[in-house]
Amino acid sequence: MHFTLQQLKLFEAVSRNNSYTRAAEELHLTQPAVSIQIKRLEEQCGLPIFESVSKKIFTTAAGKALYDASLDILNRAEELKNTIEELKGVVKGPLRLSVVTTSKYFMPHLLGTFLNQYPEVEPKMVFTNRARVIQRLYDNEDDFVVMGQTPEDDKLETYPFLENILVPVAHPDHPLAKKKKITLKELVKERFLVREEGSGTRLVFDRLLEKNEFKVEPYMELGSSEAIKQGVMAGLGLAILSLHSLRLEQDAKKLVVLDVEGFPIKRRWFAVHMKGKKLSLVAQTFHDFILAESNNILGFNKK
């Protein structure tokens, strides 16, 4: 059997999408061109690799075997390409990252500055919740991940690169907005909008309450910092948020940071990967870049 890498790429895309049309769109080809190559691939196999059921396509047993082999071959080909580029000393090729959602307020800025220096890097940055980032970390789906609350695991390498300051926020008209030296006991009497369980900010707040033997029943549980900010601006309650996420709202005077004992809580953002993982030249270069340049790029060294 003689397969080309292009045929295997087409086959992988059709299998993953269960659609000739979506695969063609993804690869910027016409559907007939994809169909012709898949037909040639089937001829090489001597067995059908797709079957149509109720106008939907599925891989056959032969197709599933070919799919597994295709992934391995394509991954090895990509690794070879990257190795050759690294031997040339060229910072070029894919960069795969997973980052927690709150980091969307600074990671795109860091990546954008990096890409200005290394325009041949091909980035893929997945924004998701902490639990999913951790899953991707252990499944080795990315070069490295970015999060605030790292798992306690000695199999991980963690590199702090940026301060993460957590603060209590309120609507400017809230009764506590102008009060000084608010006690934690006063604070916990208020309604709180919180992230889902397992998120970094939720973990920090829960630990603070536990340490001080307080309990807060969340008024609302929301899936993003943006949703929480909108809720606070609507007067639905208070929240604990990263200072990184508040620049626009503070400038517009739509949210205020409360003066509460025990705050701000100063944490760190971390670049994390499995211990012993060898980063590609692209990943290592970006890794070193954010560790060295984050504060300067984001203006946190300015007085």
State where each predicted segment sits.
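A late-sequence structural motif
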Residues: 256-300
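Secondary-structure junction motif
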Residues: 177, 191-212, 243, 279-283, ...
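Flexible hinge/capping segments at coil-to-helix
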Residues: 88-89, 155-192
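Hydrophobic hinge/microswitch elements
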Residues: 129-134, 138-141, 147-148, 206-256
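A short LG(V/I)-centered, amphipathic sequence patch enriched
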Residues: 42-61
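N-terminal winged-helix
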Residues: 31, 82, 88-118, 122-126, ...
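Short helix-boundary/capping micro-motifs
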Residues: 12-28
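Short beta-strand-centered segments that line the small-molecule binding cleft or hinge
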Residues: 2-3, 68, 109-113, 131-170, ...
